[in-house]
Protein backbone atom coordinates (compact mmCIF):
# COMPACT_ATOMS: atom_id res chain seq x y z
CA UNK A 1 0.00 0.00 0.00
CA UNK A 2 1.08 3.53 -0.71
CA UNK A 3 -0.09 6.74 0.90
CA UNK A 4 0.18 10.49 0.47
CA UNK A 5 -0.29 11.86 3.96
CA UNK A 6 -1.13 11.19 7.57
CA UNK A 7 -3.12 14.09 9.04
CA UNK A 8 -3.12 14.63 12.79
CA UNK A 9 -5.89 16.21 14.90
CA UNK A 10 -8.34 16.32 11.98
CA UNK A 11 -11.89 17.55 12.67
CA UNK A 12 -13.31 17.44 9.15
CA UNK A 13 -13.30 13.73 8.29
CA UNK A 14 -15.39 12.15 11.04
CA UNK A 15 -16.56 12.56 14.63
CA UNK A 16 -14.16 14.18 17.07
CA UNK A 17 -10.43 14.63 16.61
CA UNK A 18 -9.01 11.98 14.31
CA UNK A 19 -5.94 10.78 12.49
CA UNK A 20 -6.49 10.45 8.73
CA UNK A 21 -4.59 8.14 6.38
CA UNK A 22 -4.73 9.37 2.77
CA UNK A 23 -3.99 6.33 0.60
CA UNK A 24 -2.81 6.31 -3.02
CA UNK A 25 -4.97 4.75 -5.71
CA UNK A 26 -8.44 5.57 -6.99
CA UNK A 27 -10.27 4.38 -10.08
CA UNK A 28 -13.30 6.67 -9.66
CA UNK A 29 -11.50 9.85 -10.79
CA UNK A 30 -14.41 12.11 -9.82
CA UNK A 31 -14.69 15.41 -11.65
CA UNK A 32 -13.36 18.22 -9.40
CA UNK A 33 -12.02 15.72 -6.85
CA UNK A 34 -10.32 17.46 -3.92
CA UNK A 35 -7.39 14.99 -4.08
CA UNK A 36 -6.59 14.07 -7.70
CA UNK A 37 -2.93 13.66 -6.76
CA UNK A 38 -3.98 10.49 -4.89
CA UNK A 39 -5.46 8.70 -7.92
CA UNK A 40 -2.23 6.99 -9.03
CA UNK A 41 -1.75 3.78 -7.00
CA UNK A 42 2.02 4.07 -7.60
CA UNK A 43 2.13 7.63 -6.23
CA UNK A 44 3.00 8.85 -2.78
CA UNK A 45 5.10 6.93 -0.29
CA UNK A 46 5.36 3.29 0.66
CA UNK A 47 3.33 2.60 3.81
CA UNK A 48 6.04 1.22 6.08
CA UNK A 49 6.52 0.49 9.78
CA UNK A 50 7.39 4.13 10.47
CA UNK A 51 4.07 5.27 8.97
CA UNK A 52 2.18 2.67 10.99
CA UNK A 53 4.01 3.75 14.14
CA UNK A 54 3.05 7.38 13.45
CA UNK A 55 -0.62 6.35 13.27
CA UNK A 56 -0.37 4.29 16.45
CA UNK A 57 1.30 7.18 18.30
CA UNK A 58 -1.69 9.34 17.37
CA UNK A 59 -4.20 6.66 18.37
CA UNK A 60 -2.42 6.31 21.74
CA UNK A 61 -3.61 9.82 22.61
CA UNK A 62 -6.81 9.66 24.70
CA UNK A 63 -8.37 12.66 22.93
CA UNK A 64 -8.12 11.04 19.46
CA UNK A 65 -11.51 9.49 18.59
CA UNK A 66 -10.18 7.20 15.90
CA UNK A 67 -8.85 6.90 12.39
CA UNK A 68 -10.30 7.81 9.02
CA UNK A 69 -9.18 6.07 5.83
CA UNK A 70 -9.50 8.28 2.76
CA UNK A 71 -7.50 9.05 -0.32
CA UNK A 72 -7.58 8.01 -3.07
CA UNK A 73 -9.85 5.12 -2.29
CA UNK A 74 -9.00 2.69 0.51
CA UNK A 75 -11.03 0.04 -1.33
CA UNK A 76 -8.99 0.34 -4.53
CA UNK A 77 -7.62 -3.09 -5.46
CA UNK A 78 -4.08 -1.93 -4.62
CA UNK A 79 -5.16 -1.03 -1.06
CA UNK A 80 -7.93 -3.32 0.09
CA UNK A 81 -5.91 -6.13 1.70
CA UNK A 82 -3.39 -3.86 3.42
CA UNK A 83 -6.13 -1.52 4.63
CA UNK A 84 -8.12 -4.48 5.99
CA UNK A 85 -5.07 -5.82 7.82
CA UNK A 86 -4.29 -2.41 9.31
CA UNK A 87 -7.91 -1.99 10.40
CA UNK A 88 -7.87 -5.42 12.08
CA UNK A 89 -4.72 -4.47 13.98
CA UNK A 90 -6.21 -1.12 15.02
CA UNK A 91 -9.47 -2.73 16.22
CA UNK A 92 -7.48 -5.22 18.30
CA UNK A 93 -5.11 -2.65 19.78
CA UNK A 94 -7.62 0.22 20.11
CA UNK A 95 -11.11 -1.30 20.53
CA UNK A 96 -12.62 1.99 21.72
CA UNK A 97 -11.43 4.02 18.72
CA UNK A 98 -13.71 4.35 15.70
CA UNK A 99 -12.78 3.59 12.11
CA UNK A 100 -14.25 5.71 9.32
CA UNK A 101 -13.85 4.83 5.65
CA UNK A 102 -14.41 7.03 2.60
CA UNK A 103 -14.98 5.28 -0.73
CA UNK A 104 -16.42 6.08 -4.14
CA UNK A 105 -18.09 2.66 -4.11
CA UNK A 106 -21.70 2.25 -2.98
CA UNK A 107 -22.76 0.47 0.20
CA UNK A 108 -24.88 -1.96 -1.77
CA UNK A 109 -21.81 -3.16 -3.71
CA UNK A 110 -19.42 -3.49 -0.76
CA UNK A 111 -21.48 -4.47 2.29
CA UNK A 112 -20.34 -8.09 1.95
CA UNK A 113 -16.62 -7.23 1.85
CA UNK A 114 -14.72 -8.76 4.79
CA UNK A 115 -13.24 -5.34 5.57
CA UNK A 116 -16.67 -4.04 6.67
CA UNK A 117 -16.45 -5.94 9.96
CA UNK A 118 -13.85 -3.37 11.06
CA UNK A 119 -15.56 -0.20 9.78
CA UNK A 120 -17.76 1.84 12.12
CA UNK A 121 -18.81 4.57 9.70
CA UNK A 122 -18.72 4.54 5.91
CA UNK A 123 -19.06 7.56 3.65
CA UNK A 124 -20.03 6.05 0.32
CA UNK A 125 -20.51 7.22 -3.25
CA UNK A 126 -18.54 9.16 -5.79
CA UNK A 127 -18.27 12.91 -5.39
CA UNK A 128 -20.71 14.48 -7.87
CA UNK A 129 -19.93 18.09 -8.65
CA UNK A 130 -23.55 18.84 -9.65
CA UNK A 131 -24.60 17.77 -6.13
CA UNK A 132 -21.78 19.59 -4.33
CA UNK A 133 -22.84 21.29 -1.11
CA UNK A 134 -20.22 22.85 1.17
CA UNK A 135 -22.70 22.89 4.08
CA UNK A 136 -22.84 19.10 4.28
CA UNK A 137 -21.19 17.43 7.26
CA UNK A 138 -18.45 14.87 6.45
CA UNK A 139 -19.26 14.62 2.74
CA UNK A 140 -18.88 16.70 -0.38
CA UNK A 141 -22.04 15.99 -2.36
CA UNK A 142 -25.63 15.17 -1.43
CA UNK A 143 -25.60 11.74 -3.11
CA UNK A 144 -23.05 10.49 -0.59
CA UNK A 145 -24.25 8.80 2.60
CA UNK A 146 -22.76 8.64 6.10
CA UNK A 147 -23.60 5.07 7.13
CA UNK A 148 -23.45 3.36 10.51
CA UNK A 149 -21.91 0.13 9.22
CA UNK A 150 -22.30 -2.10 12.25
CA UNK A 151 -25.97 -1.19 12.81
CA UNK A 152 -26.59 -1.69 9.10
CA UNK A 153 -24.97 -5.14 9.10
CA UNK A 154 -27.04 -6.25 12.11
CA UNK A 155 -30.33 -5.44 10.38
CA UNK A 156 -32.55 -8.08 8.83
CA UNK A 157 -31.99 -6.36 5.49
CA UNK A 158 -28.50 -4.81 5.47
CA UNK A 159 -29.05 -3.55 1.90
CA UNK A 160 -30.96 -0.64 3.47
CA UNK A 161 -28.26 1.25 5.36
CA UNK A 162 -28.74 2.91 8.74
CA UNK A 163 -27.50 6.48 8.48
CA UNK A 164 -24.97 7.55 11.10
CA UNK A 165 -26.73 10.87 11.64
CA UNK A 166 -30.34 9.75 11.51
CA UNK A 167 -32.31 12.14 9.34
CA UNK A 168 -29.22 14.10 8.29
CA UNK A 169 -29.05 14.04 4.51
List PLM regions with ranges:
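N-terminal [4Fe-4S]-dependent radical SAM core
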Residues: 1-22, 35-41, 158-165
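Structural recognition of alpha->loop->beta junctions
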Residues: 53-56, 60, 111-131
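Short pre-active-site segment immediately N-terminal to redox-active cysteine/selenocysteine motifs
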Residues: 25-29
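Flexible, glycine-rich phosphate/dinucleotide-binding loops
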Residues: 12, 108, 131, 155
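Short, conserved loop/helix-junction motifs that constitute active-site signature segments
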Residues: 93, 114-117, 140
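P-loop/Walker A phosphate-binding loop and immediately adjacent motor/lid segment at beta-alpha junctions
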Residues: 77-83, 87-91, 132-169
Amino acid sequence: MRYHNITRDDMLNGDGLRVVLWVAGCSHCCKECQNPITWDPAGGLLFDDAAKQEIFEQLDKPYISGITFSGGDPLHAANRLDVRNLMAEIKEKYPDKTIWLYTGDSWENILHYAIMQYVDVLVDGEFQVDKKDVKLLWKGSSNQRVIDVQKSLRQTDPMVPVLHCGDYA
